[in-house]
From Swiss-Prot:
Binding site for ATP: G30, E31, N32, A33, Q34, G35, K36, T37
Protein name: DNA replication and repair protein RecF
GO terms, molecular function: ATP binding; single-stranded DNA binding
Pfam families: SMC_N (PF02463)
Gene: recF
Major subcellular site: cytoplasm
Protein function: The RecF protein is involved in DNA metabolism; it is required for DNA replication and normal SOS inducibility. RecF binds preferentially to single-stranded, linear DNA. It also seems to bind ATP.
Family the entry assigns: Belongs to the RecF family.
Gene3D superfamilies per UniProt: P-loop containing nucleotide triphosphate hydrolases (3.40.50.300), RecF/RecN/SMC, N-terminal domain (1.20.1050.90)
GO process annotations (BP): DNA replication; DNA synthesis involved in DNA repair; double-strand break repair; SOS response
Organism domain of life: Bacteria
Cellular component GO terms, alphabetical: cytoplasm
Length: 374
C-alpha cells in the first residue's frame, strides 16, 4: 500500500495543502520548525486517528481556528480508498470511502504506518509505558480484536479505579460490584495479554533475523514479556483470566489502600535481551540502537505477513541518529518495497546511492513545493 494523496486543512501550521506523493522514497527537506514533522504527524494521524506527539487533539487544530481536516487516498493493488478525519472541539469522526465509521477501531487498519523517530530509541531504554504504547500502536493496526479489547479494558479500568476510590471513603460499601468489574477487567485483560505474547513471538522472529545481520552473527536478540503472570499460566486466555482473577483477590487490600488497580496489562512490560542480558540495563548505546532498529525493521515484514500489504514508513530525522552502517541497513531494507517519508535538513544526510529516484519536497513555513532536484 502507499499514500497517493494527502490534503490538510487547518492542521498545525498547514492552512491548506494538497499534495501527491511517489510510491517510493519521499524526502521532506527544510530547516527546523518549518513543518516537516507536522506533515509526518498528519500521515500518522490519518492512519491511527491519534497523534504520536500529543494526547490532546486540540493541539492539532491550527491556532485561532475551530476545526481541522486530514484526508488522503490510499492505493492498494488495484483499488484506491479515500480516507478522511474531521476534528473540532466536539470531537472527531473518521470516514472510509466517504462513509462515517461508527467506531474508530473500524477505521484503523485502512492505512498502516510505522514511525521511526529519535525518541523511538527509547523503546529499549525508556519506561515500561513507552514499550506498552509501542505494542498497542503497532499491533493495533494489525488486529481490530486487539483494539476492541484495549478500548474495553481502558473503560472498565477507569470504572474500577473510580469504584475503588469510593470504597476508600466507604469501607462498608458493596464489594459485589467490585467483583463484577474485576471479572470484566480480567476477561479483557486476558485477551490483551495473550495477544501481546503471540504478537511478540512473531516480532521476535523477524527481529532476530535483522539483528543477526546487523551484528554479523555475534549477538542474539530475544524478548521477554514481563508480568506477574508466569509463562505456564499464559498459554491460553482461560489460564490468564484465572490468574488475573486470583491476583485481583490477592491485591484487593492493597488496592483499597492505594485507591487503584495494581495488576493487569496496563502495568506489564517487555524486556529486550541481547545474549541473555537486559540490553536496557547492561547494553551499550550501540547495542540499544541496534536493538531498536532491528525491532523497527522487523515490523515492516511482520505487518506485510499479517495484513498482506507493506506499511508506509515515516522516518523523522532519524538518519542523523544512526551511524553509516545502521543507516545502510535501514535504507537497504526498505529499498524498492516500502513507501518511505524521510525528513531532513540536508540531502547530504541521505545516502544517495541507496535511493532510487526520490521525490524531494521543500517545506518552508507550512508551504510545500516539489523540488526539481531529484
Amino acid at each position: 500500500m502507499y499514500l497517493k494523496t494527502l490534503e490538510l486543512h487547518n492542521f498545525r501550521n498547514y492552512a491548506d495543502l494538497v499534495v501527491e506523493f511517489g510510491s517510493g522514497i519521499n524526502v521532506l527537506l527544510g530547516e527546523n520548525a518549518q513543518g516537516k514533522t507536522n506533515l509526518l504527524e498528519s500521515i500518522y494521524f490519518l492512519a491511527l486517528t491519534r497523534s504520536h506527539r500529543t494526547n490532546s487533539d486540540r493541539d492539532l487544530i491550527s491556532w485561532k481556528t475551530k476545526a481541522a481536516r486530514v484526508s488522503g487516498s490510499v492505493q492498494k493493488e488495484h483499488t484506491v480508498t479515500p480516507l478522511e478525519i474531521n476534528l473540532s472541539s466536539k470531537g472527531k469522526n473518521a470516514k472510509v470511502n466517504h462513509l462515517e465509521q461508527s467506531r474508530l477501531s473500524q477505521y484503523v487498519g485502512q492505512l498502516n504506518v510505522i514511525l521511526f523517530a529519535p525518541e523511538d530509541l527509547s523503546i529499549v531504554k525508556g519506561s515500561p509505558a513507552v514499550r506498552r504504547k509501542f505494542i498497542d500502536m503497532e499491533f493495533g493496526q494489525m488486529s481490530s480484536k486487539y483494539l476492541y479489547n484495549s478500548a474495553q479494558y481502558r473503560s472498565v479500568l477507569k470504572q474500577r479505579n473510580q469504584y475503588i476510590k469510593q470504597l476508600q471513603f466507604n469501607p462498608k460499601g458493596d464489594q459485589v460490584y467490585l467483583d463484577v468489574l474485576s471479572d470484566q477487567l480480567a476477561a479483557h485483560g486476558a485477551e490483551i495479554i495473550f495477544q501481546r505474547i503471540q504478537f511478540l513471538k512473531k516480532l521476535e522472529k523477524w527481529s532476530q533475523e535483522v539483528h543477526k545481520e546487523i551484528s554479523q552473527g555475534k549477538e542474539k536478540l530475544s524478548f521477554q514479556y514481563v508480568s506477574p503472570i508466569s509463562s505456564d499460566q499464559a498459554d491460553t486466555t482461560e489460564k490468564i483470566y484465572a490468574a488475573l482473577q486470583a491476583l485481583f483477590q490477592k491485591q484487593r487490600e492493597k488496592e483499597l489502600q492505594q485507591g487503584k488497580t495494581l495488576v493487569g496489562p496496563h502495568l506489564d512490560d517487555v524486556r529486550f535481551m541481547v545474549n541473555d542480558k537486559n540490553v536496557s540495563t547492561f547494553g551499550s548505546q550501540g547495542q540499544q540502537r541496534t536493538t531498536a532498529l532491528s525491532v523497527k525493521l522487523a515490523e515492516i515484514d511482520l505487518m506485510k505477513e499479517e495484513t498482506g500489504e507493506y506499511p508506509v514508513l515515516l522516518l523523522d530525522d532519524v538518519l542523523s541518529e544512526l551511524d553509516d552502517s545502521r543507516q545502510t541497513h535501514l535504507l537497504t531494507a526498505i529499498q524498492n518495497k516500502v513507501q518511505t517519508f524521510i525528513t531532513t535538513t540536508s540531502l547530504s544526510g541521505v545516502a544517495q546511492q541507496l535511493i532510487n529516484e526520490p521525490h524531494v519536497f521543500n517545506i518552508d513555513h507550512g508551504v510545500l513545493m516539489q523540488s526539481k532536484e531529484e
